[in-house]
Amino acid sequence: MNKSSRVLDVIVIGGGQAGLALGWHLQQHGLDFLILDEQTRPGGNWRNYYDSLQLFSPAEYSALPGMVFPGDPKSYPLRHDVVQYLEAYAAEFQLPFEGDTRVVEVVQNDKAFEVRAANGSTFTARAVVVASGAFSRPYTPDIPGLESFSGTRLHSSGYRTPEAFAGQRVVVVGAANSAVQIAYELASVAQVLLATREKIRFFPQRILGLDFHAWLKFTRLEHTRWLSDQSTPVLDTGKYRKALDTGRLQRKAMFQQVLPEGVVWPDGTTHQVDALIFATGFRPNLEFLAQLPVGDQQGRVLQRNGVADQVPGLYFVGLPRQRNFASATLRGVGADAGYLMPRLLRHMDRVGSTETPAQRSRNPATGLQGKRASHRRQPS
C-alpha cells in the first residue's frame, strides 16, 4: 500500500465538471487539495458519451467559474468540445489532478478521512467532496426476458455512431433528450421505434428569440422547487416533433416483455428487433462510501444541498437536483460548489489541523492559521 504522509485539506473524488468547478473554488480559498479520478485525464464521463452528443444549453450558459466556453456563445457545443474545454480548464488553473486512481473506499478516522484507491494508494484529508456526479453507473430497467435477447443490447453510454446499426430494426428506450437525439440520428440509417412509458414532453428550445436556459436564468425559475420536481422535457427546435408527426420517427408505449428475437407490446403483438438501446439514465456510483451512513434503503443519498446529513466533513457536488434544476449541469455545478465553500471552511475551523508538529514545521503555510489568513486574502 502506497500511503501518503501528506495530510490534505480536501480530497475531491471525480475529475469531471463538478470536481473541476469545486477545485477552482478550493484554489480561490488557498486550500490544499487533490482531485482523484479513475480516468487518465480530466473530463469525467464526457469522454464516454456518444460522438454526436450536443449540449442542450448554449455555450454562454455552459461554462465553469472563471473561464468562458470558447467559440460562438450562442452555439450548442458537441461532446468533444466539452472534453477539450474541461481539459483546458484544468490546465489553465493548474488544478492538482491525479488520474488512473479509482477510489474504492472512504473511511472516517477521528478528525480525518482516509481515501483508498484500487491502485493501492491511500490519501488522508480533513474533508472529502464526492464529485463523481450522477452519470457514472448506467441504469437499465429490469424487464422480463431481457437476458434472453439474442440481438445487440446496450445502454446509451455504449452507443457511439449510427453507422453501426445501418439497415437494422432498432428500438430506443427512453423519453428524454438523449433517447430522442439518438433515435433521430439512427432514423437516417435504420428502422427506429421509440419505446416510452409516457408521452414525450417537448419544450421549445427558443422562446421569443431567447434560449430556454436564458429564460430559466432570468426568471430564476430553475431555483424553484416546482421545476426541480418536474420530469425533464425534450428541448426541441421543431425537428424532433416534426419527425414524429411525419412518421420519420415512431413512438410506441413501452414493451412488456423481451423475446430472443424481439419484444412484446402491451397489446400482445410482437415485433422483431435487431438492437435494443436503453437511454434510461444513470445512477450515482457510491459503493466506495459503503463504510459511511450516506444512503437509505431506497438508494437515496442522505444529503441536503450537498452537505451529508450524518457525516461531518463529507460533501457532494453534481447530484441531480442537488439544489436546483441545474445542479448536474455545466452551468450549475459552479454555483453549487460555491454554496459549499463557507460550510466546508467552517468544518475546517471545527476540526483544526490534522498535521503533526513535525509536518507543520516543515510546511508552516499549511497550518490552520496560515490557511485562514489565505481565505481572507483570496476572493470568494
Residue ranges and their predicted role:
Residues 55-73:
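Glycine-rich flavin
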